[in-house]
A protein has these predicted regions:
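Sparse recognition of residues in long alpha-helices and their boundaries
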Residues: 61, 68-69, 80, 120
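Post-cleavage N-terminal segment of exported redox proteins
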Residues: 1-47, 177-189
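Short, solvent-exposed loop/turn and secondary-structure capping segments
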Residues: 23-29, 66-68, 73-77, 132, ...
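Electrostatic cytochrome c docking/interface patches
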Residues: 33-57, 69-77, 91, 189
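Electron-transfer interface patches adjacent to heme c in soluble/periplasmic c-type cytochromes
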Residues: 11-20, 77-172, 182
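The canonical Cys-X-X-Cys-His
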Residues: 52, 58-67, 175-179
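Secretory-pathway/luminal and periplasmic proteins that interact with or process carbohydrate-rich
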Residues: 63, 142-143, 185-187
Length: 189
């Protein structure tokens, strides 16, 4: 067989090589990944936490925050190293793209206060003066006379309109519920 003149053979070999590589690089690993079982004790998100996850995706939070702890000493403050089962119930898994902000894998344990999270969502510099995270004030409203059912967010003076009370909207609560749900399951070795 002369490959210099037999173009059908060249195209056939290229297609065969492409298909073979596709099977070994993409298809077989994907089939193996589908067999991954959830980490024992892992619960699927529901209710406000699930809706908050959708808002997290919509706002692009994964651009600056990761949800993946590397098994390295430098990542020890964020929790144990992540394993495949930690993401078995997520679609898509939210690993993040870069760690401009802190890793959120275990933020539900590290920062469990609803009020702190709401203040941070409204204006991050109100609780972390060096934060470069943008605020999300559109998830809040201002009222002169809040209702008893309103969730009041104690924003410091100068960071909110004068004579106004900051009230968390449903979406703000949903995002915070999602963040509070981010807790690693302990794994027995």
């Amino acid at each position: 067989m002369n490959l210099h003149t037999n173009h059908k053979a060249i195209i056939g070999m290229a297609a065969g090589l492409f298909l073979t590589l596709s099977l070994f690089i993409a298809v077989f690993p994907a089939l193996e990944a589908e067999k991954t079982l959830p980490t024992p004790g892992l619960q699927a998100l529901s209710g406000d936490a699930l809706l908050g996850r959708e808002l997290y995706l919509k706002e692009g939070c994964g651009v600056c925050h990761t949800q993946f702890v590397r098994d390295l000493p430098v990542d020890a403050p964020w929790g144990r190293g992540s394993i495949a089962g930690d993401y078995a119930l997520e679609d898509p898994p939210l690993l993040g793209t870069q760690r401009t902000g802190p890793d959120l894998t275990n933020v539900g344990l590290r920062q469990s206060s609803e009020i702190w999270n709401l203040i941070h969502l409204y204006n991050p510099r109100a609780v972390v003066t060096t934060s470069i995270m943008p605020g999300y004030p559109w998830y809040f409203e201002f009222k002169s006379n809040p209702q008893p059912s309103d969730i009041i967010v104690p924003i410091p003076d100068g960071m909110k309109p004068p004579q106004q009370t900051v009230i968390a909207r449903t979406e703000a609560i949903q995002i915070v519920r999602y963040l509070q749900s981010l807790r690693q399951i302990e794994v027995l070795e």
